[in-house]
């Protein structure tokens, strides 16, 4: 983060934590305290503790305004409307008064972009744009994905997607008649929405009744103009054993499912894998995410 302010020997870095992310504030406080002991000027603040002054962005230290050089954004873009100081932060960044990281890249919120990788009209484009080695890796990582587009088709046309009763779809609502085996699919909302994170808007086809599946498909089609949905082949996460601490501090071996969230830093034209967040969840959870009964661990890459 300090490298984002190359003109400063010891820049002032603020970790700005929103109310929506407040459960992580104690961890950020701990991290900032440790970095301060190492001589770095790093501060963990709530987003409402920063304020504008003379075009720059500041916070209060014992009654004195301290100018901020770098803001680590610990808030989501979908939550901007609920953050009173967000326009001050963005304005200071636009004016070159602060560096902001992670960068504002809303396209990362769109699950629908995953469907573009498997789109039959884009196969030649990916062959020309991505190396064979990279395509093989991406093909193994990205499950087959389709955008739920309810636009009517000509009578002789079919959707390039999953099957229902062994037949191609003419409408996404045809998928309501799919067998339970064919419903090994997951329906997700894409983009900015309160249900688009934390698995709130996720429906696994063979895990709900036929009626619930049909209702979810109807909702996805009805909301296509404002909030796109995607359907993906459902893949279970890996199951493995890992040592955990019990409430009394004893170590025991537990079975669970693992999710890895990689974190990358972009330095100029170079992209570096900095680490990953490993989430170890109970084995009975089909949908895994940051949850109270799961354990998080940070994996650093050197």
PLM features: residue spans?
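Domain-scale recognition of functional cores that engage charged ligands
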Residues: 1-302
């Amino acid at each position: 983060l300090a490298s984002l302010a190359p003109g400063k020997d010891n820049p002032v870095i603020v970790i700005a934590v929103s109310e929506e992310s407040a459960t992580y504030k104690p961890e950020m406080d701990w991290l900032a305290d440790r970095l301060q002991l190492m001589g770095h000027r790093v501060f963990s603040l709530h987003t409402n503790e920063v304020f504008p002054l003379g075009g720059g962005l500041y916070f209060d230290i014992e009654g004195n305004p301290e100018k901020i050089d770098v803001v680590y954004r610990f808030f989501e873009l979908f939550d901007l409307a609920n953050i009173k100081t967000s326009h001050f932060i963005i304005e200071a960044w636009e004016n070159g008064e602060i560096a902001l990281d992670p960068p504002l890249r809303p396209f990362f919120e769109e699950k629908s972009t995953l469907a573009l990788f498997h789109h039959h009209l884009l196969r030649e484009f990916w062959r020309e744009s991505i190396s064979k080695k990279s395509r093989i890796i991406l093909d193994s990582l990205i499950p087959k994905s389709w955008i739920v587009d309810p636009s009517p088709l000509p009578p002789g046309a079919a959707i390039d997607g999953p099957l229902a009763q062994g037949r191609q779809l003419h409408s996404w609502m045809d998928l309501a008649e799919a067998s339970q085996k064919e419903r090994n699919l997951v329906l997700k909302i894409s983009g900015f929405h309160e249900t688009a994170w934390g698995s709130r808007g996720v429906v696994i086809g063979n895990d709900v009744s036929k009626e619930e599946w049909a209702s979810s498909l109807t909702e996805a089609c009805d909301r296509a103009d404002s909030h796109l949905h995607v359907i993906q082949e459902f893949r279970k996460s890996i199951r493995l054993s890992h040592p955990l601490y019990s409430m009394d501090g004893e170590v025991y071996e537990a079975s669970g499912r693992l999710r890895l969230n990689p974190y990358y830093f972009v330095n100029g034209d170079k992209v570096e894998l900095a680490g990953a967040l490993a989430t170890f969840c109970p084995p009975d959870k089909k949908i895994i995410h940051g949850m109270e009964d799961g354990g998080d661990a940070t994996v650093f890459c050197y």
